[in-house]
Amino acid sequence: MDSHRSLMEEFEGFPKKVLIGNFSQDVIIDRCKGLTRFLNFVHKEGVLSRTAIFSKFLYHSEVKATNDYLLQSQFDEACPILENTYVLLDSLQRDTGLILRTLCQLVVCLYAVGRYESAHAYAAVTLAKFHHSPTNRKIGRDLYLPLLVFCDNLWGVLGKDRRVIRARLEAARKPTRRSDDLTPNLLDKLRDDIALRTLH
């Protein structure tokens, strides 16, 4: 509510009501369409989407919830929230670091609940984001090597060809000279990051 009030004060014309309650399917569909139009407007204008207040209003509580779920190994609960958060962040082209962390969290959660094919699909998306952008590799450099080790294992579980993953692993290890034994587990790395962010 405080975030909504702040947005109303800062941006003239921001919707004045937060509606909660039990609604019919038609009402929910209409509201979803309205939200889609609103997000398209936000994306087009640009200014609003870059404010901390808007970020808090839109996805701060979801990020906090999934962080808590990850720390408590409640992977089933985290999966749908992470999927929705990723779609939202990606559609807004917002906070690349958060998108990469969200995808990595989603991949490990899907794997933990045995949804290996879904984990593979999102892992492929995550790898593509790293490989197509030097900026992303720089932003997510602490996650990249643990992600590759994770993917090597996941590809093996699914019987996928691991040659490309292993070539990327070899290339990524050269500057660090790390073996698998010295590379942090992706889940442990994500949990450490959450703990560090909580301290600041």
List where the protein language model places each region.
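Intrinsically disordered, low-complexity regulatory regions
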Residues: 2-200
